[in-house]
């Protein structure tokens, strides 16, 4: 129900909403100011290249019960692979037809559920070498998770065509790009962290910190807890 969704967004905490648009000046530009009534942005998706993200759905009364049910259902499966679920949350993505989300990576494990419309979700394999060491260090320094696209990456991607009712697991930090089909799209992402991924965060943050002093460390590798412990000691 698009009208109900528009009403829900219009009444929500603006801090939990992020809006981006393609403009002649910049692709995927963050909208610096939200209009007084957000309903028009939802109803006008067809005539724009717009991306609306609702974050922390566990804080939205209309979505929190669904998020809790999904996490309860997937926990027995995912915990055998990623360890205990840490910092779970969820996002709703509402996108204009034809919108292309730039190549990027996310620091979470993710299961994406396609609700309305269609999209092609293309994941790059680890063999592509992304995100690189510099990409990781930049992300943990500034939060910038965008990656440079190179034409040769197109042949390496794994494309998944998603229709309503489909779901897709997106691995931790897997590079991906998304192309929306001919109709507006709604997707739900349920994400979580693991203790290992949080240690990766601290290990990469230590790399970035020492890099400011021209000390270059290799990637954290299989034992990130060593650098994570060092960073936590420095923070005390």
Where are these regions (language model features)?
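Transition-metal
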Residues: 1-68, 72, 207-214, 236
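A short secondary-structure junction signal
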Residues: 64-67, 102-106, 122-127, 131-136, ...
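A short glycine-rich, His/Asp/Glu-containing loop-to-beta-strand
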Residues: 85-93
